[in-house]
Amino acid sequence: VSNTFYVPGEQRAAKVNDLFASIARRYDLINDLQSFGLHRHWKRRVIALAAVTTGVRALDLCCGTGDIALSLAERGAEVTGLDFSAPMLAVAGQRKRGANPIFIQGDALKIPFPDNSFDIVTMGYGLRNLASWEQGLAEMQRVAKPGGRVIILEFGKPANALWRSLYFTHLQCSVPLTGWIFCGNSQAYAYILESLKHYPAQLAVAAKMREMNFSQARVINFMGGAMAINYAVKAG
């Protein structure tokens, strides 16, 4: 079954932008509902791995409504949140208390910063949405400082076949239903499974990071691999 919002290639960005524009106002509510609030715990693990010290520079890509960016800022980092969805950034801007973080509209495949700019580069639920996840990794590596931490939270593919089948059924049935009830848009949430089918997931991302000469590349799985963090450090 095709999905309104999933298209391969160059049209991908425009379609994903339409998707997030359609759900921005209810995005946080539906995240809480479909993950039973667990996404907040997973994001706290991202923040812990970031090991923020006062004054470090952090970039949160595909920042959405700002959960990760705001948490990094609360711990003393100087944070830039980047997303290409203006409606999502509008929600993020309403949530911030002061000048930090700075939220900007931009493309994670063409990050508007010089090489070696950030101590911490994070991305939550963004990598599988990019037209090229490999190019996304390359851009994250480029803007990270030597020794900088790169941390990616994303939907995963469980290794256990039975659990994977049950999980994919949940994504196919329950999640779009939640989207329809609370957002009037089932297709936007059916997109999660469609995009995940085309995404190689956590083990392939870790292998690619090692191939790119990241150090300390590792995977932290949650819920038997249904969610995962890819963590690595830029060599140098």
Regions of interest found by a model, annotated:
Residues 134-149:
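A short glycine-rich, Lys/Arg-flanked "PGG" loop and its adjoining helix->strand segment in the class I
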